[in-house]
Amino acid sequence: EQWQPQLHR
């Protein structure tokens, strides 16, 4: 499974 980068700040 691909790890999705966390784009929340």
Swiss-Prot record:
Tissue specificity is:
Expressed by the venom gland.
Looking at the keywords, is Cytoplasm present?
Answer: no
List UniProt keywords, sorted A-Z. Answer: Pyrrolidone carboxylic acid, Secreted
Q: Main location per UniProt?
A: secreted
Q: Would you tell me the Gene Ontology cellular component terms?
A: extracellular region
Subcellular localization: Secreted
Q: Which residues carry this modification: Pyrrolidone carboxylic acid (Glu)?
A: E1
Q: What else does the entry mention about this protein?
A: Neuropolybin refers to the sequence pEQWQPQLHR, it is synthesized based on the inspiration drawn from the peptide Ppnp7, which contains uncertain residues.
Task: State its role.
Answer: Peptide with unknown natural function. Protects against maximum seizures in a pentylenetetrazole (PTZ)-induced epileptic model. Acts in a dose-dependent manner when intracerebroventrically injected into mice and rats, but has no effect when intraperitoneally injected. Since it does not alter the spontaneous behaviors of the animals, neuropolybin could be considered for further research as a potential treatment for seizures.
What is this protein identified as? Peptide Ppnp7
Q: Which organism is it from?
A: Polybia paulista (Neotropical social wasp)
